[in-house]
């Protein structure tokens, strides 16, 4: 017999919600949550669907945060089975979004239904917030909803994000923060010319090399609490026409910083601009701010999560701020304590993405226990 959470996960995977499409996932979830007594508000913006579902009223407000969109699967022929036709083989569920993060979303729904059935008059507010714009541009999703909440004065005390945080076994890692992410696209101007006449040209590669070397060599900080040190990585460099006898007229450099709470995007931008100015480069520089870092210090949410996960796993979880970015970066500035708890992440964004059925079926009880410890 198929469990409720497994069936719901399969129903969600079967909806090919490649970002920013939702493909009906949130409508399915809203129907279930409405039937359980949640008030559901659809906050669509452009091509992005967002769902805000609440049960109860007043403080404290606990949000279960997730996304219904998935990354593209690539050629279906590379998969052992259709990425949008969920299939269980040898106790493992395969399909795009199984781990990231339709399994967590399904577990949120089942846990929320069970919680309000057992505690219909619970203190505070239990909320579910979902978007179809986490894997893409992340502009019209939770970023937009957070701005709306700020305008409304919507309080959020605690936020549990269902991102796949576990490494080897379910619950072995508790994410207590994330680094900020800042990207830059630098164009250094030179003067094109023949390689035999360098005195008539200005090679932007040669001009930029000392500045790039300084950027790469710089130790931005020594880390912060659970954070590794700030890192700058050059991801792309392009110059030239493809001919080996032409000095290029410009150099294009793409880079990204993952940074600790020692910094914010504005101060990093100022530091890098000052460095480029010291090297007297002629350049343009465009920035993209993906999100500021957030960190949840020791407090109620972190303590409860550590105790619940420790009891579940049989050992205290590792508490980490590693990995990429998540939508919690938009909720944390509202004053919320934020953590991330979810399934094993070994197969996310890969061909044959999967989750162990046993892990999936354990998730609702894990989330429900967290909710009960916080709201009852």
Swiss-Prot record:
Residue sites binding Zn(2+) 2 per the record: 100, 135, 349
Q: Which cofactor does it need?
A: Zn(2+); Co(2+)
User: A Gene Ontology MF term for this entry?
Assistant: zinc ion binding
Q: Which residues bind Zn(2+) 1?
A: 67, 100, 163
Specify one Pfam family.
Answer: Peptidase_M20
Record SUPFAM superfamilies: Bacterial exopeptidase dimerisation domain, Zn-dependent exopeptidases
Q: Which UniProt keywords apply?
A: Amino-acid biosynthesis, Cobalt, Diaminopimelate biosynthesis, Hydrolase, Lysine biosynthesis, Metal-binding, Zinc
Task: Kindly tell me the pathway this chain contributes to.
Answer: Amino-acid biosynthesis; L-lysine biosynthesis via DAP pathway; LL-2,6-diaminopimelate from (S)-tetrahydrodipicolinate (succinylase route): step 3/3
* Active-site residues from the entry: 69, 134 (proton acceptor)
Q: Which GO terms describe its biological process?
A: diaminopimelate biosynthetic process; L-arginine biosynthetic process; lysine biosynthetic process via diaminopimelate
Question: What remark does the entry make about the cofactor?
Answer: Binds 2 Zn(2+) or Co(2+) ions per subunit.
Q: Key word Metal-binding present in the record?
A: yes
Q: What are its E.C. numbers? A: 3.5.1.18
Its UniProt entry gives the catalysed reaction(s) as: N-succinyl-(2S,6S)-2,6-diaminopimelate + H2O = (2S,6S)-2,6-diaminopimelate + succinate
InterPro entries in the record: ArgE/DapE_CS, Bact_exopeptidase_dim_dom, DapE_proteobac, Peptidase_M20, Peptidase_M20_dimer, Peptidase_M20A
What is the similarity comment for this entry?
A: Belongs to the peptidase M20A family. DapE subfamily.
User: Any idea what job this protein has?
Assistant: Catalyzes the hydrolysis of N-succinyl-L,L-diaminopimelic acid (SDAP), forming succinate and LL-2,6-diaminopimelate (DAP), an intermediate involved in the bacterial biosynthesis of lysine and meso-diaminopimelic acid, an essential component of bacterial cell walls.
Q: How does it assemble?
A: Homodimer.
What name appears for this protein in its UniProt entry? Succinyl-diaminopimelate desuccinylase
Organism whose genome encodes this protein? Xanthomonas campestris pv. campestris (strain 8004)
């Amino acid at each position: 017999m198929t469990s409720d959470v497994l069936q719901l996960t399969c129903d969600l995977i079967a909806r090919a919600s490649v970002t920013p499409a939702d493909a009906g996932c949130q409508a399915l979830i809203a129907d279930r949550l409405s039937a359980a007594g949640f008030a559901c508000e659809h906050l669509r913006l452009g091509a992005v669907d967002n769902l805000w579902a609440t049960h109860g009223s007043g403080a404290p407000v606990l949000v279960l945060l997730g996304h219904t969109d998935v990354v593209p699967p690539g050629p279906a022929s590379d998969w052992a089975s259709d990425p949008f036709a969920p299939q269980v083989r040898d106790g493992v569920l395969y399909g795009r979004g199984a781990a990231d993060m339709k399994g967590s979303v399904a577990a949120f729904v089942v846990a929320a239904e069970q919680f309000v059935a057992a505690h219909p008059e619970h203190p505070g507010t239990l909320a579910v917030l979902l978007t179809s714009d986490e894997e893409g541009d992340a502009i019209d999703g939770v970023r937009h909803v957070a701005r709306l909440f700020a305008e409304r004065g919507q309080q959020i005390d605690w936020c549990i994000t269902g991102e796949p945080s576990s490494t080897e076994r379910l619950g072995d890692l508790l994410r207590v923060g994330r680094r900020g992410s800042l990207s830059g696209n630098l164009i250094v101007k030179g003067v094109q010319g023949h390689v035999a006449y360098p005195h008539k040209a200005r090679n932007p590669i040669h001009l930029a090399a000392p500045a790039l070397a300084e950027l790469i060599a710089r130790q931005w900080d020594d880390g912060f609490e659970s954070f590794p040190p700030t890192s700058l990585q050059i991801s792309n460099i392009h110059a030239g026409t493809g001919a080996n006898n032409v000095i290029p007229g410009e150099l294009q450099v793409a880079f990204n910083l993952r940074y600790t709470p020692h910094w914010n995007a504005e101060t990093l931008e100022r530091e890098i601009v000052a460095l480029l100015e010291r090297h007297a480069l002629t350049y343009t520089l465009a920035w993209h701010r993906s999100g500021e870092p957030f960190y949840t210090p020791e407090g109620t949410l972190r303590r409860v999560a550590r105790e619940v996960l420790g009891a579940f796993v049989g050992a205290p979880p590792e508490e980490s701020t590693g990995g990429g970015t998540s939508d919690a970066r938009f909720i944390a500035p509202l004053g919320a304590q934020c953590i991330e708890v979810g399934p094993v992440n070994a197969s996310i964004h890969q061909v044959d993405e999967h989750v162990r059925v046993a892990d999936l079926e354990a998730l609702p009880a894990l989330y429900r226990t967290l909710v009960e410890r916080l709201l009852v």
